[in-house]
Each structure stands twice: as structure tokens, then as C-alpha cells.
């Protein structure tokens, strides 16, 4: 009985720890589990000679654009940074 109780406690702790991880989109529509401490998803967009460029990922703090032509948005829920042409889940 003690073994069963201990097993349930361990499984609960592991599940609670996994549930704390944020999921953000990276390239294309590939979801990625962020590292501990990365509590934001971001989308960075800018234009270059080839058209509109899009970068997405995880961050501990919202990235600050280094140039005025770069636009950054941040959010804090799972899969909240889809490609701009897609709707969030």
C-alpha cells in the first residue's frame, strides 16, 4: 500500500512539473516546449529584400526590437504565436 501511495505522489509531482511548461511555435507550425523560465511566446516580423520575414519562439522576457522596422508581439498562453496567417489554438 505504501508503494502505491509513493508511486501516486511521484507521478503527481512529475505531472505538475510538466504542466508548467509553455508551448510556443517555432518554425512553420511546429510546436515547441519552452525551457524552464521561458514564460512568453514571441513573434518578430520585418521586411527585407525577399518580403516579410517571421521569427517565432520562446523567451523569458519580451524581446526588444533593435530597429524601428522590426515588430515584436508577445503572449503567455500555449500556442498563442501561430503564423500571422493562422488562427491561435
Curated annotation (Swiss-Prot):
One of its GO terms (cellular component) is extracellular region. The keyword Aminoacyl-tRNA synthetase does not apply. Expressed by the venom gland. PROSITE patterns: SNAKE_TOXIN. Keywords: Acetylcholine receptor inhibiting toxin, Disulfide bond, Ion channel impairing toxin, Neurotoxin, Postsynaptic neurotoxin, Secreted, Signal, Toxin. The keyword Disulfide bond applies. Its main location: secreted. Residues 1-21 form the signal peptide. InterPro entries: Snake_3FTx (IPR003571), Snake_toxin-like_sf (IPR045860), Snake_toxin_con_site (IPR018354), Toxin_cobra-type (IPR054131). It comes from the Eukaryota. Disulfide bonds join 24-41, 34-58, 62-74, 75-80. GO terms for molecular function: acetylcholine receptor inhibitor activity; ion channel regulator activity; toxin activity. It is found in: Secreted. Pfam families: Toxin_cobra-type. Has the length of long neurotoxins, but only 4 disulfide bonds, as short neurotoxins. Binds with high affinity to muscular (alpha-1/CHRNA1) and neuronal (alpha-7/CHRNA7) nicotinic acetylcholine receptor (nAChR) and inhibits acetylcholine from binding to the receptor, thereby impairing neuromuscular and neuronal transmission. Belongs to the three-finger toxin family. Long-chain subfamily. Type II alpha-neurotoxin sub-subfamily. This is Long neurotoxin 1.
